[in-house]
């Protein structure tokens, strides 16, 4: 016990030393690190994307610039962001895209130079929107194409509509998804319909609120995995190794405040209806373990070991652990499983698992 007490006291002294007694060389190194830190921009397209940007801005997102783009001037006025861009001023006159993705696309092309200027110095660009409407569905692929052309690692985090929103909206979403696939390194898809499997019989208003929460947590969790100092830090090169050409990706989110909180949180994430794929064939995984001040390294390792045991031995796994003071006694796990496109097919009613055809097996 005395040994442990001494270790804790020495650790406390070391923290004080790190904060108070930096040499000129150390300060120079810190300044250099700040200058060379990966520049990350989050772009919210359309109504759902703007809502996400506003929430991220209000809650605080560490180490990222926020940009909101829209064809609707009124929505943009209500949005909080570091940079706002009203796209397609000549085309829509600030009145919106009327649910037409083609108008959203043309509006983004009209404002391409302004979009490019807003993300020009970015090493990584996150694009977020709710697919199915006009502005987000139409503009997000244009933003992604611009991002790729400037050499940024380009990741989109998007939602698919609820089935109750109608076939036209779902058809728009699937077409937008196909265009996004062409211009993104990794495309993270959140099928809203699957939320009903998590919370059955949700009222309509609550369903949309839950969808927004999932989108916000996914974007924030991904960004802060890179930008936020934590127990285990992940650098940009690590993330790039998983997300560069990561293809289609799915997420799983779980949390628990029980005695076995880490075990239960990762189990929930792996069994999340949102992660509706066979992950054994995935090419990579990003794992973000979040928890309060008493989050232990052993808990983080337990999460990673559990996920690793389910993946192909050749899959690239990157993980990090950060402290979130808002998570009182709760461990939250965010999984992003990449390279799952071979298991998924796109239909006008959403994403479906492909039926695997078994060959060489005699019929009985």
Curated annotation (Swiss-Prot):
Keyword list (alphabetical) reads: Cell cycle, Cell division, Cytoplasm, GTP-binding, Nucleotide-binding, Septation
List the SMART domains hit by this protein, alphabetically. Answer: Tubulin, Tubulin_C
Per the UniProt record, which residue ranges are transmembrane? none
Q: Which GO terms describe its cellular component?
A: cell division site; cytoplasm
Q: Which InterPro entries does the UniProt record give?
A: Cell_div_FtsZ, Cell_div_FtsZ_CS, FtsZ/CetZ, FtsZ_C, Tub_FtsZ_C, Tubulin/FtsZ-like_C, Tubulin/FtsZ_2-layer-sand-dom, Tubulin/FtsZ_GTPase_sf
| GO terms for biological process, alphabetical | cell division; FtsZ-dependent cytokinesis; protein polymerization
Residues that hold GTP according to the record: 47-48, 97-99, 134-136, 165, 169, 212
Q: How does it assemble?
A: Homodimer. Polymerizes to form a dynamic ring structure in a strictly GTP-dependent manner. Interacts directly with several other division proteins.
Please give the NCBIfam families that the UniProt record associates with this protein: ftsZ
State its role: Essential cell division protein that forms a contractile ring structure (Z ring) at the future cell division site. The regulation of the ring assembly controls the timing and the location of cell division. One of the functions of the FtsZ ring is to recruit other cell division proteins to the septum to produce a new cell wall between the dividing cells. Binds GTP and shows GTPase activity.
Protein name, as recorded? Cell division protein FtsZ 1
* UniProt source species: Methanocaldococcus jannaschii (strain ATCC 43067 / DSM 2661 / JAL-1 / JCM 10045 / NBRC 100440)
């Amino acid at each position: 016990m005395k040994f442990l007490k001494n270790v804790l006291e020495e650790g406390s002294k070391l923290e004080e030393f790190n904060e108070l007694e930096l040499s000129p060389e150390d300060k120079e190194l810190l300044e250099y690190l700040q200058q060379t830190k990966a520049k990350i921009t989050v772009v919210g397209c359309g109504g759902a994307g703007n809502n996400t940007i506003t929430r991220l801005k209000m809650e605080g997102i560490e180490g990222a610039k926020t940009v909101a783009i829209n064809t609707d001037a009124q929505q943009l006025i209500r949005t909080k962001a570091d940079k706002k861009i009203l796209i397609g001023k000549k085309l829509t006159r600030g009145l919106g895209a009327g649910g037409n993705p083609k108008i959203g696309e043309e509006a983004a092309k009209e404002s391409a130079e302004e979009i490019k200027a807003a993300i020009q110095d970015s090493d990584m660009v996150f694009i977020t929107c709710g697919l199915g409407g006009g502005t987000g569905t139409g503009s997000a692929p244009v933003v992604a194409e611009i991002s790729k052309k400037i050499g940024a690692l380009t990741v989109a985090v998007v939602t698919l509509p609820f089935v109750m929103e109608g076939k036209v909206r779902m058809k728009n979403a699937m077409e937008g998804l196909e265009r996004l696939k062409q211009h993104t390194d990794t495309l993270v898809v959140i099928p809203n319909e699957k939320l009903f499997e998590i919370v059955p019989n949700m009222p309509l208003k609550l369903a949309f609120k839950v969808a927004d929460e999932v989108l916000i947590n996914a974007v924030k969790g991904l960004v802060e995995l890179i930008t936020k100092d934590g127990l285990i830090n992940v650098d940009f090169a690590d993330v790039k190794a998983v997300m560069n050409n990561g293809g289609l990706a799915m997420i799983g989110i779980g949390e628990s405040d029980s005695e076995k909180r880490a075990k239960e949180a990762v189990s929930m994430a792996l069994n999340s209806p949102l992660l509706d794929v066979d992950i054994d064939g995935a090419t990579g995984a990003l794992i973000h373990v979040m928890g309060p001040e008493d989050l232990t390294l052993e808990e983080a390792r337990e999460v990673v070991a559990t996920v690793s045991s389910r993946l192909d031995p050749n899959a690239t796994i990157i993980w990090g652990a950060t402290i979130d003071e808002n998570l009182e006694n709760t461990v939250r796990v965010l999984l992003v499983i990449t390279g799952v496109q071979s298991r998924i097919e796109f239909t006008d009613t959403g994403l479906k698992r492909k039926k695997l055809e078994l060959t060489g097996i005699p019929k009985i």
